[in-house]
From Swiss-Prot:
The gene is ctaB1. It is an enzyme of class 2 (transferase). Pathway: Porphyrin-containing compound metabolism; heme O biosynthesis; heme O from protoheme: step 1/1. Its EC number is 2.5.1.141. This is Protoheme IX farnesyltransferase 1. It is found in: Cell inner membrane. GO terms for cellular component: plasma membrane. It comes from Mesorhizobium japonicum (strain LMG 29417 / CECT 9101 / MAFF 303099).
Length: 311
């Protein structure tokens, strides 16, 4: 019996010595935090007033759904996680949580999040959340991740949907504005993860994951990172260009985009053995996304405050 067959057959919910911290780690809290923040911004910048109780329920349900996706991802990827130094100490490959526990935990949280969002907030948002979990687990984790170097490009759609879900929770619809936010995250995802792959290329090779540096080579990956940065920077300004925000957001987003291009250019110009620029881009990319969405939120709050004063 192969490792994969053994892992997939071990779906019994048997007790382990897992702690609450181990189950919390299954949620991928850092990834969850990004999803929750972008969903929160999507909800807050949507037009119209949102009942605070509904807003809290929506964000909580989205957080639970994001955590559920993380738990299911760790269940399925336990075999390859065990082969990579970056992930070998995760709860399932380390043996602290059994595969059955991770699977059951993820499925229960998935159902809880979708039903809560549907019953208490709206079924469009719930449907989008269900699709996001399905896409991340079935399309990305089970299929794309192990089969194509475009795994992150296509699979990035799942990570880009939270602001759309937040917008739908607030309005009951999907607006052009929310699709712009989707596009920002979608274009941000490849350079973010390819930068990581450049300095973790050995890990991905050991696990047999066809990340771009392992398949196309570091030089091609560096060129593609710069290409995506050149696309991302102007797209990041679209909320202002389309009139969704004031010029203050446009200036902030443009400056952040220039920084992204600059870091990407340094990666493009670096030698194959020089990893510092890739590490710097990876760190900056996280700052970029949080800062762009924070600027969007701050700009929206400020504009509404000024409008209320002038009313």
């Amino acid at each position: 019996m192969s490792t994969r067959e053994g892992r997939l057959k071990d779906t019994s919910i048997r007790l382990s010595e897992a702690t609450a911290a181990d189950f919390f780690a299954l949620l991928k809290p850092r990834v969850m935090a990004l999803a929750v923040f972008t969903a929160f911004v999507g909800l807050m910048v949507a037009p119209g007033a949102v009942n605070p109780v509904i807003a809290v329920i929506a964000i909580a349900a989205i957080a639970i759904g994001a955590g559920a996706a993380g738990a299911l991802n760790m269940w399925y990827d336990a075999d390859i996680d065990a082969l990579m130094s970056r992930t070998s100490k995760r709860p399932v490959p380390s043996g602290r949580v059994t595969p059955g526990e991770a699977l059951g935990f993820g499925l229960v949280l998935s159902a809880l999040s979708v039903m809560t969002l549907g019953v208490l907030v709206g079924w469009l948002a719930a449907s989008l959340l269900a699709f996001t979990i399905f896409f991340y687990i079935v399309i990305y984790t089970m299929w794309l991740k192990r089969s194509t170097p475009q795994n992150i490009v296509i699979g990035g759609a799942a990570g880009a949907l939270p602001p759309v879900i937040g917008w739908a929770a607030a309005t009951g619809a999907v607006g052009v504005e929310s699709l712009v936010l989707f596009l920002i995250i979608f274009l941000w995802t490849p350079p973010h993860f390819w930068a990581l792959a450049l300095f973790k290329v050995g890990d991905y090779a050991a696990a047999g994951i066809p990340m771009m540096p392992n398949v196309a080579g570091p030089a091609s990956t560096r060129r593609q990172i710069l290409a995506y940065a050149l696309l991302l920077a102007p797209v990041g300004v679209l909320p202002w260009a389309f009139g969704f925000t004031s010029g203050y957001y446009g200036i902030a987003s443009a400056a952040l985009g220039v920084g992204f291009i600059w870091h990407s250019w340094k990666v493009r110009a670096a030698s194959e053995t020089e990893l510092k620029p890739a590490k710097a881009l990876f760190a900056y990319s996280i700052v970029y996304l949080f800062a762009v969405f924070a600027a969007l939120l701050a700009d929206t709050i400020a504009m509404r405050a000024l409008m209320s004063v002038g009313a």
